[in-house]
């Protein structure tokens, strides 16, 4: 039984046990494009990946299943070398602590996503980045594009082009890196992890 066959079984919930860690060669491979129209197995895998993200952000389910919270997951992280990513970016409560009207600012499974253009300006998260496949803390600014335009297919096989900036742009670049065999710490300056250039936008 392949990794994908196991993951898409109706009874299976993706947990941290399914997520491979740094050192596994799948994380350093360039993943293969999925065939269109999508097969049922690839659609199911995307749904399972999104289910994992929702569970990871739900305190009750996360504790029950022992999950680390995540806003994105790429198929190579569950040992499936395909160009499939899921993103689930929650909206935060307002300054008074009221819950947001919409739970998520972005919720999508992207098949064969590709960055087709990007800003000249770079950006990095002030707190750095983490990864479900990396169990250690790696400090430093992960330098990425401040704005990106991404082409992708949804589970219906419809093609989309989306322009992203800020945190959502960072998230999609992190996940697209995964399908290209790149890990976030590859983008940290090894000699000066917190190096700031004049044009670098630091996002809180």
From Swiss-Prot:
Pfam families reported in the protein's UniProt record: Pep_deformylase
InterPro entries on file: Peptide_deformylase, Peptide_deformylase_sf
Keyword flag Hydrolase: yes
Protein residues bound to Fe cation: 131, 174, 178
Top-level EC class as recorded in UniProt: hydrolase
Coiled-coil intervals, chain numbering: none
Listed CDD domains: Pep_deformylase
GO terms of molecular function: metal ion binding; peptide deformylase activity
Cofactor note: Binds 1 Fe(2+) ion.
Substrates-to-products reaction catalysed: N-terminal N-formyl-L-methionyl-[peptide] + H2O = N-terminal L-methionyl-[peptide] + formate
Keyword Zinc set for record: no
Gene3D superfamilies: Peptide deformylase
Catalytic center residues: 175
E.C. number(s) listed in UniProt: 3.5.1.88
Keywords, in A-Z order: Hydrolase, Iron, Metal-binding, Protein biosynthesis
Names of required cofactors: Fe(2+)
GO biological process terms on file: co-translational protein modification; translation
Database matches in NCBIfam families: pept_deformyl
Role noted for this protein: Removes the formyl group from the N-terminal Met of newly synthesized proteins. Requires at least a dipeptide for an efficient rate of reaction. N-terminal L-methionine is a prerequisite for activity but the enzyme has broad specificity at other positions.
Family named by the database record: Belongs to the polypeptide deformylase family.
Protein name: Peptide deformylase
Species this protein is from: Streptococcus pyogenes serotype M49 (strain NZ131)
Phylogenetic lineage: Bacteria, Bacillati, Bacillota, Bacilli, Lactobacillales
Gene: def
């Amino acid at each position: 039984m392949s990794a994908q066959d196991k993951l898409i079984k109706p009874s299976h919930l993706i947990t941290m046990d399914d997520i491979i860690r740094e050192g596994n060669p799948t994380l350093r491979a360039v993943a293969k494009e999925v065939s269109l129209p999508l097969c049922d197995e690839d659609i199911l895998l995307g749904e399972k990946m999104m289910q994992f993200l929702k569970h990871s952000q739900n305190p009750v389910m996360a504790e029950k299943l022992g999950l680390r919270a995540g806003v994105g997951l790429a198929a190579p992280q569950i040992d499936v070398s395909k160009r499939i990513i899921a993103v689930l970016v929650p909206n935060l409560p307002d300054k008074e602590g009221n819950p947001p009207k919409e739970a998520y600012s972005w919720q999508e499974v992207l098949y064969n996503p590709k960055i087709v253009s990007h800003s000249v300006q770079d950006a990095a998260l002030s707190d750095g980045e983490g990864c479900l496949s990396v169990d250690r803390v790696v400090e430093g600014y992960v330098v990425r594009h401040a704005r990106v335009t991404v082409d992708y297919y949804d589970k219906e096989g419809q093609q989309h082009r989306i322009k992203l900036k800020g945190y959502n742009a960072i998230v999609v670049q992190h996940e697209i890196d995964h399908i290209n065999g790149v890990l976030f710490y590859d983008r940290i300056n090894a000699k000066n992890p917190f190096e700031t250039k004049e044009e670098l936008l630091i996002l809180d």
